[in-house]
A protein has these predicted regions:
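Non-catalytic interaction-recognition regions
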Residues: 97-119, 233, 288-290, 295-296, ...
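Short, glycine/charge-rich beta-strand/loop segments that flank catalytic centers
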Residues: 67-71, 93-96, 106-121, 139-148
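Alpha-helical recognition segments enriched in aromatics with Gly/Pro capping
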Residues: 1-33, 48, 98, 119-327
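Short phosphate-binding/catalytic loops that engage adenosine nucleotides
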Residues: 59, 133, 433
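N-terminal, positively charged nucleic-acid-binding surface of large information/translation enzymes
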Residues: 9-12, 18-104, 440, 444
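Short, polar/flexible loop-turn hinges at active-site or ligand-entry regions and domain interfaces
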Residues: 81-87, 108, 301-305
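Structural preference for alpha-helix termini/caps and helix-kink/transition segments
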Residues: 268-447
Length: 447
C-alpha cells in the first residue's frame, strides 16, 4: 500500500482514495508573469512523478494544476511591458507549456485560469460574507481568521503565536482590518489595474481564494491530495483550508504534500544572490531529459542542491540507462529474478514516493540486464519503471551503412581476419558507435 507523508498530521499515512482506483490531485501552479525557475520545475517534476507512479499502480489520476493569471506581480510586469495582463499571461503560459514539455511533464487533466472563474469566486466570497466569516472594508473583503476553527493547523501554529508576530504591523491595509492576520478575499480596484464588477464594487480576487474556488469547482468539496512547494504551506495553503472548510463544512483535502526547496551551490536560490536560474535559460545548454532526471530522482520532500557536477552526473547516469535500454534482446530470463526487482521497486516507491531508493533499484536492474538478462518481458518492465521517472527512450535505428559495417566485422571475425575486424571497430568508434562482443552476439551503444 502506498504511504504518504501528510503535512497536516506530520506522519506517514496509508493512502485511501475517496473513490476506489481514482486519485483527485490539485497542485498549485505558477504565477505567470515570468519564465519558471528551477524551483518551480522541481515542484512540477515531483508531482508529475507522483502522478506517474499512481498510474503505474493502476490508478486513474485527475491531475489539476492552475495558472495564477490575476496577481500583483502580473499587473506590475504587464504595466512595465506596456501590454495587457492577459497578453503577458498568455505569453508565459505558452512558455511554461514549452519548458515543461521538454522536461517530460505530462499535460494536466485541466489547467484552470483564474480569469475563467470570476463568477464562481465572487459567489464563494459572498457565501463567506453572508455566514459572517468575512467582512467588507473600503471595498476590500477580508476573511476573519479568529472565527476559523483551528486556523493555521497545517503550519502547526496557533492563532496566538501568529498574533504576537503580527502585533507590530501598522501599514494602511492593516488599519482596514479587524485583525492584522485577516487576509484579502477581494481587493478593491486601483487606478490602472484590471478589475471586475462585484457586490462590493470593482476589484479582483485575492491569491488564496483563487485556488480554493478552482479546486472545489473541478474536483468537489473534498479532494484526495493537495500539493505544492514547502513555501506554500503558510500562508497560502493555510488560508485555502480556512476559507474552504468554513464555506463547505467539510475537510478540504485528505492529504497535504509539499516538496522541498532547491539550493544552488549550497545557497538558497534568490535574485539578490545572483543565482536565480530560469528553466528557459537552462534548457539552452542542458538537455531537458537530463534536467528531468536530476530533479525526479531526488526524494521529493528533501531539499536538493543544484550544481554543475550534479547535472553532469545525471547526464552520465542517464546515458548508461539509455545504452542499457538499447541492448539487443536475449533468450528468456529467470522471471523470479525479474519479479524481485519489481517488488523492490514498488516497496521503495510505496514509501512516500522515495525516488532516491527507486532509482537505486533501477540501476541494480540495469546492471543485471547488462549481464545478459534482457528478454522482451524485462524490457517492458524496464520501460515502465523508466516512465515513472518521466524517461522515455526512442528506439534508435542504425542507418544501412553502419549495419553493413557491423555485418562485415562479424564476417571478418568469423574468418579470423582480426585486422579487418579491428579496423571496422575503429571506424565505427569514430562515428560514435561502440561495439560489445558478448556470448549472445554483438551489442552496440552510441556515445
Amino acid at each position: 500500500m502506498i504511504k504518504i507523508y501528510d503535512t497536516m498530521t506530520r506522519s506517514l499515512r496509508d493512502f485511501v482514495p475517496l473513490t476506489e482506483n481514482v486519485v483527485n490531485m490539485y497542485v498549485c501552479g505558477p504565477t505567470v508573469y515570468n519564465y519558471i525557475h528551477i524551483g518551480n520545475a522541481r515542484s512540477a517534476v515531483a508531482f508529475d512523478t507522483i502522478r506517474r507512479y499512481f498510474e503505474y499502480c493502476g490508478y486513474t489520476v485527475n491531475y489539476i494544476s492552475n495558472f495564477t493569471d490575476v496577481d500583483d506581480k502580473i499587473i506590475k510586469a504587464a504595466n512595465e511591458a506596456g501590454i495587457s495582463t492577459k497578453e503577458l499571461s498568455d505569453k508565459f503560459i505558452a512558455a511554461f507549456m514549452e519548458d515543461t514539455g521538454q522536461l517530460g511533464i505530462k499535460p494536466a487533466t485541466q489547467n484552470p485560469r483564474v480569469i475563467n472563474y470570476m463568477d464562481e469566486i465572487i459567489a464563494f466570497v459572498s457565501t463567506l460574507v453572508d455566514k459572517g466569516f468575512a467582512y467588507v472594508s473600503e471595498g476590500d473583503v477580508y476573511f476573519r481568521v479568529a472565527k476559523s476553527n483551528n486556523y493555521a493547523k497545517l503550519a502547526n501554529k496557533t492563532l496566538e503565536d501568529l498574533e504576537i508576530g503580527a502585533s507590530g504591523r501598522t501599514d494602511a491595509e492593516t488599519e482596514r482590518k479587524e485583525n492584522p492576520l485577516d487576509f484579502a478575499l477581494w481587493k478593491a480596484a486601483k487606478e490602472g489595474e484590471v478589475s471586475w464588477n462585484s457586490p462590493w464594487g470593482p476589484g479582483r480576487p485575492g491569491w488564496h481564494i483563487e485556488c480554493s474556488v478552482m479546486a472545489t469547482e473541478i474536483l468537489g468539496d473534498t479532494i484526495d491530495i493537495h500539493g505544492g512547494g514547502a513555501d506554500l504551506e503558510f500562508p497560502h495553503h493555510t488560508n485555502e483550508i480556512a476559507q474552504s472548510e468554513t464555506k463547505t463544512g467539510k475537510t478540504f483535502a485528505n492529504y497535504w504534500m509539499h516538496n522541498g526547496f532547491v539550493n544552488v551551490d549550497n545557497e538558497k536560490m534568490s535574485k539578490s544572490l545572483g543565482n536565480f536560474v530560469t528553466v528557459h535559460d537552462m534548457l539552452q545548454t542542458v538537455d531537458g531529459q537530463v534536467l528531468r532526471f536530476f530533479l525526479a530522482t531526488q526524494q521529493y520532500r528533501k531539499p536538493i542542491n543544484f550544481t554543475e557536477k550534479a547535472i553532469h552526473d545525471a547526464e552520465v547516469n542517464l546515458k548508461y540507462l539509455k545504452n542499457t535500454h538499447s541492448l539487443p534482446l536475449t533468450e528468456q530470463v529467470n522471471q523470479a529474478e525479474l519479479q524481485t526487482y519489481l517488488d523492490t521497486f514498488q516497496e521503495a516507491m510505496d514509501d512516500d514516493f522515495n525516488t532516491a531508493n527507486g532509482v537505486t533499484v533501477l540501476f541494480d536492474m540495469a546492471k543485471w540486464i547488462n549481464s545478459g538478462n534482457y528478454d522482451q518481458t524485462v524490457k517492458d518492465a524496464f520501460e515502465k519503471m523508466l516512465q515513472v521517472f518521466g524517461i522515455v527512450f526512442e528506439e534508435e535505428v542504425l542507418d544501412e551503412d553502419i549495419e553493413k559495417l557491423i555485418e562485415e566485422r562479424q564476417a571478418a571475425r568469423a574468418n579470423k581476419d582480426f585486422a579487418t575486424a579491428d579496423r571496422i571497430r575503429d571506424e565505427l568508434a569514430a562515428q560514435g558507435i561502440k561495439l560489445l562482443d558478448t556470448k549472445e552476439g554483438v551489442r552496440w551503444t552510441r556515445d
